[in-house]
Amino acid sequence: RKNHLVAFASRRERCFMPELNLLATLLVVALLVLWNLDFLATLLTLKNLKPELPEEFRGVWDDEKYLKSQSYEKAQAQFGIVSSISSLTILLAFWFFGGFGWVDGLVSELGFGKVGTGLSFIGLVYLGFWLSSLPFDLYHTFVLEERFGFNKTTVKTYIIDQIKSHLLTAILGGGIVALILWIFDSVP
């Protein structure tokens, strides 16, 4: 029992003090570079929005529809910035405060074997990030899209779509990940 507690305490210390080895540093840098490129592209999109209908579209679109499309594009871009800042912050906080190590310690205690532990780890991380993005998804679907008249989704349809999506992810993604984990475990 004492050895079990020492092992748990040691694993717990590692969870909350992640080391930034070369690979982890490269991953964080790549993540930040990609986020900044996406952010820059969004800013360029916002900068290039024009309040007047271009001459080329006169007679094809009316001014009201054009202004609505520009307002929608602006709202989408602004929402995307807020959403991506939130996602990036949650991911980096989870990483730097040892969230991945904590989840690993949690699922390792369950005794599911290597493949089951790997699937449990990925499933819990997926669940956590889905839950953290859920408020943004709900706002996007039921507030932002509704404001511009694009939302045809009912709450019931939304829930059914979410269930279908997660079932497909679990079956297809889980099957592929299980196969990869099994191959890694089987190859000497």
Language model regions located:
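Hydrophobic or amphipathic, alpha-helical segments that drive membrane association/targeting
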Residues: 17-188
